[in-house]
Amino acid sequence: MRIFHLITHFDLGGAERVAANIAMSKTPDMEYHIVEIMRGKSLYTNKFITEMKQAGVVCHRSLMPDVNFHFVFQRIAAILFPLRMLYIMLRWHPDVIHVHTETPDMCIYAFSRFFPFLLRRTRIVRTIHNTRLWSGLPSIASLIEPYYIRHNANIGISDSVCQSYKQRFGADAPIIHNGVSVIKQQIYPRLVHS
């Protein structure tokens, strides 16, 4: 099975880390790819790509620069993404597309409007990572949320995320507590006990 994780950029972030941890899992018969929507350019980007490649995850870099100046650039990326995704679909034929955060959500929604027939055999999964979706963008939310609800694609990462989603959009999302690797707590030698 071929699974594609779509993230905003190859950079440091909670959703990016969850996608990376899932993609790096050594699940038998699973081929993982990770696709960035906007090109990451931080000091962490190269480390992220190296980590993915060492784990056998195929990385698909974006040509669209990540400009943090205004949300309009994410909208442009979403409009242009269907052409890039067309190539990915025709070349790789993913069985599952797993989106993380609003920018990838917009991109797959846009792709589904242009090329719905290419998604007929592909399962869409969407992880909701936070309690506030589409802050300041209610018109975009009113277009995109019904798509993910209709496709039964939503998965929340916590009770609070799922409760917030149900309160705002009226739909239930199952909870899956995965994608976060367990880290052993280190003892801090200078801790003062009182």
Q: What is the role of each PLM region?
A:
Residues H5-R75, K166:
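N-terminal strand-loop element at the rim of the active site
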Residues S160, G179:
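Carbohydrate-associated surface elements
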Residues F73, M89, L118-I155, Q163-F169:
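A conserved, positively charged/aromatic
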Residues M89, H93-D95:
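Proline-aspartate-enriched helix->loop->beta-strand connector
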Residues V99-Y109, I128:
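Short His-centered aromatic/hydrophobic patch
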Residues H98-V99, G156-I157:
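Short beta-strand scaffold positions
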Residues R2, D95-V96:
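Structural motif
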Residues K47-T50, Q185-S194:
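A short helix/loop element that forms part of the nucleotide-sugar donor recognition site in Leloir-type
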